[in-house]
Amino acid sequence: VSETPGTPPVTAVNVTRLLAEAASKSGVLWVEVPDGSGAPETHAVWFVWHDDEDPRGTGPAAYVVSGEGEQHLPDLPAEVTTIFRSKDTGGRLLRLRATVRVLEGGTPEWDAAAEVLRAERLNATGDVVARWREGATIRVLSPHGRPDEAPGTYAGESGRRPVSPARGTTTRWRPWHWRGRGRG
């Protein structure tokens, strides 16, 4: 517990345990990508948390699949900021830097990651692994370092951003009770 005069006491947080619990209990995280203007572009992504428990491996990481028929995710730089949410409240819990690796198709590592993702993919139709092999990208996001935000150290702003226009968020037809059809 650390105390500064005039501020409430802050209890030390075991970030490793908190990350493992938050990542294993949630299926969505946010990825912040620099957009060139200085303001980050934030993408909500479905992921699977996986730890191969191999001491020679990369350690626990978030596996993300994107591409045709899957979630949209732009090309990611070598390092991004990830925001993990609390399963209980849905609010941000941890904000960490993460290294990004793109897995090469046809490698044993890609095949293993595809199987981990396939097992957790809801409402999958057909052979998703074959579809991913044709046109999807599998990335491994490995969080590291001290968190930018954690319990007791949150930034003051809310983090709200307008929804980016996309096929899933843009409405063309609205029901009449939502100011959609003309009255006449």
Describe the predicted segments one by one.
Residues 89-184:
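Charged, gly/pro-rich active-site loop segments
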